[in-house]
Amino acid sequence: MSTIKVLNMAGAEVGTVELNDAIFGIEPNQAVVHEVVKNHLANCRQGTQSALTRGEVSGGGKKPWRQKGTGHAREGSTRAPQWTHGGIVFAPKPRSYSYVLNKKVKRLALKSALSAKAAAGEIIVVDSIKMDSIKTKDFRAFLTAVKADGKSLVVTPAKDEVIVKSARNIPGVETSMANLINVYDILKAKYLVLDQNALAVIEEVFA
């Protein structure tokens, strides 16, 4: 097991903690990570795009000119796709882009992402992430103290409205509960800032 430092919210080292190799020490599987990120983005799509085919556009019932003798190409409708205001060929219609992945695949991708972060030294463990009041300035100071400036994912063991509201106005900073972390958010962040209790939850849920 690898050992990393545990900091307090002031950035001072207060101890160490061992990371479970079954979660933070595997060889990352990039193909699986790619598939899970693709699945996440597909599931986020609204799927509301819609356009009209030539049969659905209003008008165009009359033949614009006679078949022969005009010098024009033959035309049967002003709503054919090559015309301005004509219908769309294979027009998109509202549909769901979501699809299901095997749970084992998702779990492997999550472990791969966490292992990659651990190998890169981009996991920061804090003994307790707690704030008395909603204060964005204080939360930004905390991130600076633990050297997690920039894109960061702050993970707490349970939902903490004070932390969520303190962090939500800082560009690039996201928050999550330990049991709800996903591969996309982990990879999008430069640093993974874990409450020590959140680390215990992750190891309990995903080991």
Where does each model-flagged region fall?
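Extended polybasic, low-complexity segments that bind anionic RNA or targeting/receptor surfaces
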Residues: M1-Q46, A91-A207
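Glycine/serine-rich anion-binding loops at beta->alpha junctions
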Residues: R54-F90
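Exposed boundary/loop context
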Residues: I4, N8, E18, H40, ...
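A short, flexible low-complexity segment enriched in Lys/Arg and Gly/Pro that occurs
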Residues: A31-K68
